[in-house]
Amino acid sequence: MKIDITLKITPKMVKDAQGNEKKALVGHLGTHFDVMDKEFPLDYTERKAVVFDVSHVKDREIDISDIAIDQVEKEMFVAFYTGFIETVGYGTKEYFSKHPQLSNELLEELLKRNISMIGIDFTGVRRGKEHT
């Protein structure tokens, strides 16, 4: 089964991005891959997946206890829905500086389970210097 993770780009989102404090490059609004290695085989995009709705998590890191970790299997694509972009708008100061983040413990557990990809609807799995 394939899950459509398309984010509908509305005229308001485009207008907000054009007037934000930190200009976003054209074409960077929407889904993309941040690849840590130099190669990214296309078959990595065809995986079993699970999407965790963590939109209830506010003012703290997203942690292992916020998801059903037992649903995560080897080579799985694990996605997190926060709804953050709908709250603060794409490209705003808050979008870049106050976005949710995954706890180090959660990231370590996902790596231990040998997942293939992490999907998020916010700027990065960590903030600041830990952004990558």
Predicted regions, residues:
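Active-/binding-site microenvironments in catalytic and ligand-binding cores
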Residues: 1-132
